[in-house]
Amino acid sequence: MGKNLKLKMARVEHDMTQGDLADAIGVTRQTIGLIEAGKYNPSLALCIAICKCLDKTLDQLFWE
């Protein structure tokens, strides 16, 4: 699992910190950091919550 640069770029486009995104979806900042670093495999429900918050699709953020 590589770094999730797509997630980081989408978060930055929305002018959100890792903490802002974490608060918006109900997880810790560390969880967002680990997902972006490719060290944590989020559940489908968490992926969907992130996508809704960032106005992106699963394809755009998580799948190639």
Segment roles from a protein language model:
Residues 27-40:
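Recognition helix of helix-turn-helix/homeodomain-like DNA-binding domains
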Residues 5, 29, 43-47:
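Short alpha-helical elements of helix-turn-helix
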Residues 62-64:
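Short amphipathic recognition helices of helix-turn-helix/homeodomain-type DNA-binding modules
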Residues 45-60:
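DNA major-groove recognition helix of helix-turn-helix/homeodomain DNA-binding modules
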